[in-house]
Amino acid sequence: MNTVVLRETHGKVGLIRINRPEAMNALNDAVADGIAAAVDAFEADESIGCIVLTGNEKAFAAGADISVMRQSSFDYMHAYKTDFVTRNWERIRTARKPVIAAVAGYALGGGCEFAMMCDMIYAAENAKFGQPEIKIGTLPGAGG
């Protein structure tokens, strides 16, 4: 069971919650795979009318998991060829049901781009969007 992505049903709404609070919901392969699986499940469920993607009150998603990128074995070229972080994002864009990003707290880098992949963004008053990749010497993974 994928515990970094939680799936709930509330009436006709399918809720997908990124659940990595210790890492400010930083995105990694497990998160990307879990979100894609949840979207697939809600798409197959005829009782679901829309899908809401969210994080927690501190962070929607604070971008790519930089701790993975800092590992000496991390290969940037391989990461871009294999769609590190952005893998499965196309699944959100192609969903037949509307996907709404409910953003509270930080949506930075890949988290900001992830929210932009949704059909609509509902931003809380404390939502903060940004593309800080330049500060670590890289470009936005999905183009910004």
What role is predicted for each listed range?
Residues M1-N56, S72, E90:
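Conserved CoA-thioester-binding segment of acyl-CoA-metabolizing enzymes
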Residues I16, L53, D65, F114-M116:
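Hydrophobic/aromatic residues within transmembrane alpha-helices
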Residues I16, R20, P98-V99, F129:
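Buried hydrophobic positions in well-ordered alpha/beta secondary-structure cores of metabolic enzymes
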Residues V31-I35, F84, F114:
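Hydrophobic alpha-helical membrane-association signature
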Residues G55-R91, A107, K135-G137:
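Glycine- (often His-adjacent) and acidic-residue-rich active-site loop
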Residues N88-A95, A102, L108-G144:
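CoA-thioester-processing core
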